[in-house]
Amino acid sequence: MASKCPKCDKTVYFAEKVSSLGKDWHKFCLKCERCSKTLTPGGHAEHDGKPFCHKPCYATLFGPKGVNIGGAGSYIYEKPLAEGPQVTGPIEVPAARAEERKASGPPKGPSRASSVTTFTGEPNTCPRCSKKVYFAEKVTSLGKDWHRPCLRCERCGKTLTPGGHAEHDGQPYCHKPCYGILFGPKGVNTGAVGSYIYDRDPEGKVQP
């Protein structure tokens, strides 16, 4: 039974479909949610199950501020501060509050765990190793937080970059050869990543 395209909600037939984020799309419906640029299956970032181009849209909207995690979408541009009256010159601090600050000593810096809670809340669990993923070591892909070494191709174990890979049933795969061999539509060139698959002979050997 043909599935429905999540963008236009119309039926997607085999000859016109591309698969990404666990869904079947019309080729021209797989577009960036922000700038509407046409995307290729697996060759894009995602957030909350929706596709985004890596740059500038994903990086601008969702990349961690000031932290380069080495993956796609690892930068974000700071938004300007909300407009309001700017205060110039020294700010007067009441004497009582100044004395209170002296008594309590200098403010303590946040611990590693508390800083994680401040930015991300309770740490998520890595879908690969089932251990907690802290902010400084995480990469985000397929709507989940992973340890960087845990984001690997399900078939060959190659380490992947966030958004820079294909996916099937919520699992990451490298584009070539794994996704193409396992899931690419046979004999149909959709012009997208992972659009070819090689038939296997009865003995299990891959035929070009």
From Swiss-Prot:
Keywords, ordered alphabetically: Acetylation, LIM domain, Metal-binding, Phosphoprotein, Repeat, Zinc
Chain spans, region Disordered: 98-119
Residue numbers of N6-acetyllysine PTMs: K23, K138, K144
PROSITE patterns: LIM_DOMAIN_1, LIM_DOMAIN_2
Cellular compartments per GO CC: cell cortex
Modified residues (Phosphoserine): S104
InterPro entries reported for this sequence: Znf_LIM (IPR001781)
Tissue expression summary: Widespread tissue expression; highest levels in the heart.
Domain LIM zinc-binding: 5-57, 126-178
Keyword Transferase part of the UniProt annotation: no
Parts forming coiled coils: none
Biological process terms in GO annotation: hemopoiesis; positive regulation of cell population proliferation
GO function terms (MF aspect): zinc ion binding
Entries under PANTHER family matching the protein: CYSTEINE-RICH PROTEIN 2, CYSTEINE-RICH PROTEIN CRIP FAMILY MEMBER
Assembly, per entry: Interacts with TGFB1I1.
Protein name: Cysteine-rich protein 2
Gene this chain is encoded by: CRIP2
